[in-house]
Design a protein with these regions (language model features):
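Solvent-exposed helix/loop surface patches that form functional interfaces
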Residues: 125-177
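Non-transmembrane domains of secretory- and envelope-associated proteins
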Residues: 2-30, 109-119, 124-126, 131, ...
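Intrinsically disordered, low-complexity boundary segments flanking structured domains
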Residues: 36-43, 155-158, 171-174, 216-221
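Short Pro/Gly-enriched beta-strand edge/turn motifs at strand-loop
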Residues: 52-55, 153-156, 186-191
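Short secondary-structure transition/capping segments
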Residues: 94-103, 131-138, 257-258
Length: 258
């Protein structure tokens, strides 16, 4: 088991001017939690393109609410996330987020609303080695929408440092997710979470793809009762992506918001 010790989200090694994975591949057997978190931090550096589908179920008083997130990514900077809501009976209920690294466009099919805005510039000149680990953030090759499952699954460094490392973590074994071997991590009472689950019986289980380091499943539970499950049902690193994948024009009748 480990407590809040891993603070290396921003410390990606640089060799000959280029960042590279600190751990190229996991050794046989089970790694330590710190080794696994370091391996996960560099996940996106193990592929040039990615296709991923995440199915999310949130269990509440009205039953399971389902969302599906379809992710397409090409380094550097090109990314597209389409979120659909199968549990919503409204026809055509989907949301799009697409970026080329300079402009981010969003579109809600249900409301016919869109936005087109410059990417927010990141703070520059902050050497991670000059600040405490918990005060640093991971700088991705290709950005994804902030505070979303696609961002967390593909860029897990921040989640490992700011959430999992605030609880008690241990590796409980292996599993298979999306047809691929995965390592299972358990975490009791991570404190950096929403207030309504900030309680001692809150538990998170994740699985980590053994080859690439992305998160492939997350299960949240309170008092032994599952409240949320998000699982990758399709994972294709280095997938062949059509040239049109990252092209988008707002449909006629779209209202653009600033």
């Amino acid at each position: 088991m480990t407590g809040p010790t891993w603070t290396r989200a921003a410390l990606v090694p640089v060799r000959r001017g280029a960042a590279h994975p600190e751990i190229a591949a996991l050794p046989n057997g089970l790694p330590t939690v710190d080794e696994l978190f370091t391996f996960m931090r560099d996940a996106e550096r193990r592929f040039e393109t990615l296709r991923m589908r995440i199915e999310e179920r949130v269990y509440a008083g009205r039953g399971a609410q389902i969302q599906v997130h379809d992710v397409a990514l090409r380094h550097p900077n090109q990314a597209r996330v389409v979120t659909t809501f199968p549990s919503n009976k409204a026809a055509g209920h989907s949301e799009l987020w697409i970026s080329d690294g300079e402009i981010v466009r969003t579109y809600s099919a249900q409301h016919k609303l869109g936005t087109s805005r410059p990417v927010r510039p990141r703070v520059r000149g902050l050497d991670p080695k000059s600040y405490p680990g918990r005060s640093t953030v991971y700088d991705p090759i290709t950005a994804l929408p902030a505070e979303t499952l696609p961002e967390m699954f593909v860029h897990p460094a921040g989640y490992c440092q700011n959430v999992l490392s605030t609880g008690v973590c241990w590796i409980s074994g292996t599993d298979r997710v999306a047809g691929r071997e995965a390592i299972v991590v358990e975490c009791d009472h991570p404190r950096a979470v929403e207030r309504y689950v900030d309680r001692p019986d809150y538990h998170v289980q994740i699985t980590v793809d053994r080859l690439d380091g992305v998160i492939t499943r997350m299960v949240e539970s309170v008092g032994g009762e599952v409240t949320r499950v998000a699982e990758v049902v399709n994972l294709a690193p280095d997938a062949a992506l059509p040239a049109t994948t990252f092209e988008f024009e707002f449909p006629e009748g779209t209202t653009l918001l600033y």
